[in-house]
């Protein structure tokens, strides 16, 4: 084994699956791969296992949007037992790749793909070892030996040449457990199997909030269909005061999933990596947000939707966002949901995209990788302006979830309150939380909810939250930061209390979430040198440099970037 390249994959969820696929597909028998998995099963990770889903939770992607694995979802569905199909109300004969499916079932698919890849590895002579029920407690870099030590919770140490961190989602607990009925996230959803006779506060309206709503609704009432096939909800008579109240900054619901023309978010019209490199070189070493907005959003729209293009061609980014948000703000969110549901239904029926929405998803994906080259000024613009619109429009809430939200609202058990930018939540020692906010009429509100659930989705974690302490102590990793293009703007931001630092050259830097990585997802140290041995694929720790990540597409793309570098 000594002469083999020893590679550790930390985490056997979807990211680990795509990384393992890349390694196995090389057919390289000079590799020795070890997968460390905290649980007793590979593939499903958090979102597609009981840690992140119950039977009622569905994916927001369909088979045709999943990057290729070993077998297609369509073919796999034909191989599963009738009991499983019946449990999830799936007819294998009528199943097609355009349908979303239950998350737990999708988790089984990912596990099956991992099994097939292991079989492939055995057949091609690629050495691998899976360490189930193993938690990695530390990563110790040994540059002098060109190796990395992985330490597990039981104190055991193993040496590797390369480590790829694929640890997936992480929701730190702040008050959950010490404050009754206060939840830092809705996961695992089994904890929300609660019968409640009071209003429940839900922070956020993202897909994470929809997960919480789907679970709570089932424990406090029933869904049925009327004679026209329309869904309606009846709360239990014993719970007359049960209600769910979503709180959002802008009082908006996510947009409804529609037919995507290019299901993998990789559009032919996008700027190439070389074009982006050339642009950065010509622009003082910065990527311009306006340039990306013109080239990766407006131009493709000109060809596909010339009428829409005429409306937006002279708009700057902020103006475009304000325009789109204003359209959403004018309408009651549930009326808008109803209208978008009908529009999305037509889009799916006729397999015709809603092109500007699709391109917004493409723009978000295209911005993700080079975002670390934005100036601090442009990153602030992105976070303040574009990100809120993107998070609403490309959430792609599935049809059945839209139907449930509309039925719950009609039954009077679901409402949405806009709370603005300055709202604050305080845990209440008796249970739940106090929601402090300014309402639409500029009145200060302070409302106690006996149950509170934070549903804003995966937070971008701070540098200090990285669980592998030796990486921080030995300065193997460093906090992510972005340079200000203008020193005046940097000074202004520093004086206004933003996390800004100044170096010896007089340049100003904005601290952003997570750690510093390069374009190959290698971690970087305090001196700006990249590490040949350690790769970071765990999205919660690179949020500053990767502001948007699109699940499986992200795993597919990044594993491809890493394998190129590993196999040099």
Regions found by a protein language model. Name each.
Residues 50-75, 242-243, 265-272:
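N-terminal glycine-rich dinucleotide-binding loop that anchors FAD/FMN and/or NAD(P) in oxidoreductases
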Residues 1-46, 50, 93-568:
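Flavin (primarily FAD) cofactor-binding/catalytic cores of flavoenzymes
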Residues 61-112:
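Conserved N-terminal/central alpha/beta ligand/cofactor-binding core
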